[in-house]
């Protein structure tokens, strides 16, 4: 489940002239990388947003995961690409409400499967990293992975039959751990740098670029640079 604000309000801390375009591009790369994990692990990707233009663009561009997977066609060897679908954020009451809504929709659509919530700004995410993290999650209960700073959350997993119970926001990693989620951060550590590198500021964006961003983000950066020139 990937939450995305309306593009006009997304990434308000990212002081970049192409902020809205970058928010869309990063979400596109994130969705595509998730879709390329392999359907034996990721059955479907669900975007929760009230931005119809973003919804249409991301679902259209993420259909062919092979175009956007940065470490090769992972999905082809693991059951193929997962579908990328979008639903409106009907609660429209913030991030955690959107994630709870998305989790309910995902559970109805894909019964018997667990649910994972992930940041939609993981411009440098590799499918293999997400695959490793999801496979590291325990078969029961919940699991959490901290962001690069160690205080936020980039991935929250709930096994089949468990509620997601998202607590995103300030110090969300500690809140998720205190609420019973198993911490995956120590075990995965530096092996999943793209998964842990969310992008909120220009400093974060520079760090993601060092890791290597996806094609949509790369194109958005090139467009912004050309417009600035």
Describe every region a protein language model picked out.
Residues 171, 177-229:
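Conserved alpha/beta core of the MobA/IspD/sugar-nucleotide pyrophosphorylase nucleotidyltransferase superfamily
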Residues 1-13:
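N-terminal nucleotide-binding beta1-loop-alpha1 segment
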Residues 23-41:
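A short, N-terminal amphipathic alpha-helix
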Residues 57-114, 172-175:
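Short phosphate-binding loop-to-helix
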Residues 42-51:
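Short beta-strand/loop segment that forms part of the nucleotide-sugar
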Residues 156-181:
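Short, glycine-/small-residue-rich phosphate/pyrophosphate-handling segment
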Residues 125-149:
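Conserved donor-nucleotide/metal-binding helix-loop-beta segment in metal-dependent transferases, i.e.
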């Amino acid at each position: 489940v990937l939450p995305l604000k309306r593009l006009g309000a997304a990434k308000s801390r990212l002081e970049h002239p192409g902020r809205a375009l970058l928010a869309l591009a990063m979400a596109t790369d994130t969705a595509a990388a998730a879709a390329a994990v392999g359907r034996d692990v990721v059955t479907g990707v669900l975007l929760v947003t009230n931005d119809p233009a973003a919804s249409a663009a991301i679902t259209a561009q993420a259909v062919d995961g092979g175009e956007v997977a940065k470490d090769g066609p992972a999905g082809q060897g693991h059951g193929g690409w997962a579908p990328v679908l979008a639903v409106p954020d009907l609660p429209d009451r913030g991030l955690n409400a959107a994630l709870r809504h998305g989790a309910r929709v995902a559970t109805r659509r894909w019964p018997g499967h667990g649910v994972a919530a992930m940041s939609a700004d993981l411009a440098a995410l590799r499918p293999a990293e997400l695959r490793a993290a999801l496979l590291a999650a325990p078969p029961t209960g919940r699991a959490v992975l901290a962001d690069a700073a160690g205080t936020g959350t980039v991935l929250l997993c709930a096994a089949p039959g468990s509620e997601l119970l998202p607590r995103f926001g300030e110090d969300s990693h500690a809140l998720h751990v205190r609420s019973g989620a198993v911490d995956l951060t120590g075990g995965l550590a530096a092996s999943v740098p793209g998964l842990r590198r969310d992008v909120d500021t220009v400093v974060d964006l520079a760090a993601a670029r060092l890791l290597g961003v996806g094609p949509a983000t790369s194109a958005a950066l090139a467009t912004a640079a050309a417009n600035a020139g």
